[in-house]
Amino acid sequence: MATIKEIKEFLVTVKELESPIFLELEKDNRSGVQKEISKRKRAIQAELDENLRLESMLSYEKELYKQGLTLIVGIDEVGRGPLAGPVVAAAVILPKNCKIKGLNDSKKIPKKKHLEIFQAVQDQALSIGIGIIDNQVIDQVNIYEATKLAMQEAISQLSPQPEHLLIDAMKLDLPISQTSIIKGDANSLSIAAASIVAKVTRDELMKEYDQQFPGYDFATNAGYGTAKHLEGLTKLGVTPIHRTSFEPVKSLVLGKKES
C-alpha cells in the first residue's frame, strides 16, 4: 500500500477534477489520503478559476486577433497622485493569447507578488517600453499632459511598433488605432501587464529617492501624501523631486518665498 506521502506526490500529476484516479483513491479510508484528495481538488479548481479569470481579461485582445492584429500593446501609468517623484508609464506587447498566472491590476496584486509577476511579464513580453516624466515637467504642463507624454515615450521604445493600443481610460494623439478602456488594468491582460511594470519601476525609483532624501518615507509611501511624508515636509521642507504645483507643496513653497 502506498504511503500518504507517495499519494500526495502522485496527486500533483492529476490535472482534472473528473479523473478516475480520484474515484480509485476515495476507496482508501485513511483520513490523511482523503485530506490530500480534497486539497488537490481545491488546487485544481483554483487553477480552473484562474484560467477563466485570465481568459475573461483577454476579451479585448481576442476581438483584435479576429481582425488579424497580433502586435497589441497595453499601456498604463502609475504616479498621477503623489506629491513627489515622476509619473511612470509602461507599454507592453504580450504574445498572442499569453496568460500569466496572477497577473491583474497592480493594485489588486499582493505587494509580495509584485516582483515575481513583474519578472514573468519581462520574461514573456515581446517588447516593453517605459516612459518617465519628472516632477519639473509635471509642474510645467500639468499631470494629465505629463501622463500622455510618459505613455508616448513608452510606446516610442517598442520594437516592433504596435498595430493597436489598449489604453487605461486615455486617448493619445498618435496615428495608431486605439481603444480606451475604463478600468483597463482590471479588464485587459495587456494593460494589467503594463500596470505592474509601471508600478514596480516607479516603486524602485522611489526607493532610490528615499536614500537621497531621507525623512520623507519615500520607500514606503512612493511619494503619496501619508502622515510621515507630510511630517517630513513640515520639518525638512521641499525636495528637488516634489511637485510644486500640488498642494500642500505649493503652499509651502509660496510661504517660504513670502517669509
From Swiss-Prot:
InterPro entries: RNase_HII, RNase_HII/HIII, RNase_HII/HIII_dom, RNaseH-like_sf, RNaseH_sf. GO terms for biological process: DNA replication, removal of RNA primer; mismatch repair. One of its GO terms (cellular component) is ribonuclease H2 complex. Its EC number is 3.1.26.4. It comes from the Bacteria. It is an enzyme of class 3 (hydrolase). Residues 70-258 form the RNase H type-2 domain. Its cofactor is Mn(2+); Mg(2+). Manganese or magnesium. Binds 1 divalent metal ion per monomer in the absence of substrate. May bind a second metal ion after substrate binding. The keyword Metal-binding applies. It is found in: Cytoplasm. Keywords: Cytoplasm, Endonuclease, Hydrolase, Manganese, Metal-binding, Nuclease. One of its GO terms (molecular function) is RNA-DNA hybrid ribonuclease activity. A divalent metal cation binds at D76, E77, D168. It catalyses: Endonucleolytic cleavage to 5'-phosphomonoester. Gene3D superfamilies: Ribonuclease H-like superfamily/Ribonuclease H. Belongs to the RNase HII family. This is Ribonuclease HII. It comes from Streptococcus pneumoniae (strain ATCC 700669 / Spain 23F-1). The lineage of its organism: Bacteria, Bacillati, Bacillota, Bacilli, Lactobacillales. The gene is rnhB.
